[in-house]
């Protein structure tokens, strides 16, 4: 109900030069959500919920490695009142995601996965659509951790190992760069080597 109120209400905003501006919300239309294998429920639910909350029709394409979870998540949305016409599920490998991003009715894509795949989707959207299509892509990060002389070495060691190696390092929040103050470098490196054995 709150979403409907937001969508049906225009807000008048004062402009910096005295003009009047109107802010209104409207759906994009048909949104494609492509989710990864490593957080198959959390990311998929977030993508679907956001797209539906904004009033969009949603096509879901989970990773081919998490098809059953994608099916179960979509089924739960349907069981709780989301019409099949508003949320559809497509199962298959990456060629399906590639084909779906070429469909002209797609007005937005939420994608979590590799940079190369995001670039392919972006290229499809640019080449095959007459208008600009929204692309929300989460493709990874270069995450940095700094350890200085105030660090508790045991805690830092645990945090570094978990951040770098949980999920085999295959997540966007994984540690990629570690900066260590000279004063603790040798001790921390020794502890890290010991933990990795």
Can you name each region flagged by the protein language model?
Residues 20-21, 88-110:
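A structured beta-alpha segment of the ubiquitous adenosine-cofactor-binding alpha/beta core
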Residues 45-46, 71-72, 101-102, 120-124, ...:
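Short amphipathic alpha-helical segments
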């Amino acid at each position: 109900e709150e979403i409907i109120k937001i969508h049906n209400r225009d807000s008048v905003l004062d402009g910096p030069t005295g003009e009047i501006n109107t802010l209104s919300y409207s759906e994009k239309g048909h949104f494609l959500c492509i989710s990864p294998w490593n957080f198959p429920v959390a990311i998929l639910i977030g993508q679907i919920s956001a797209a539906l909350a904004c009033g969009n029709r949603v096509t879901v394409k989970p990773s081919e490695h998490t098809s059953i979870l994608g099916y179960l998540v979509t089924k739960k949305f349907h069981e709780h009142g989301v019409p099949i016409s508003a949320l559809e599920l497509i199962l298959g490998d990456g060629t399906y995601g590639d084909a779906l991003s070429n469909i002209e009715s797609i007005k937005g894509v939420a994608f979590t996965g590799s940079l190369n795949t995001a670039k392919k989707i972006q290229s499809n959207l640019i080449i095959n659509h007459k208008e600009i299509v929204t692309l929300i892509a989460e493709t990874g990060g270069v995450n940095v951790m700094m350890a200085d002389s105030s660090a508790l070495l045991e805690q830092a060691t645990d945090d570094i190992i978990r951040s770098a190696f949980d999920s085999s390092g295959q997540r966007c929040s994984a540690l990629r760069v570690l900066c260590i103050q000279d004063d603790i470098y040798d001790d921390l490196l020794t502890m890290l080597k010991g933990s990795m054995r």
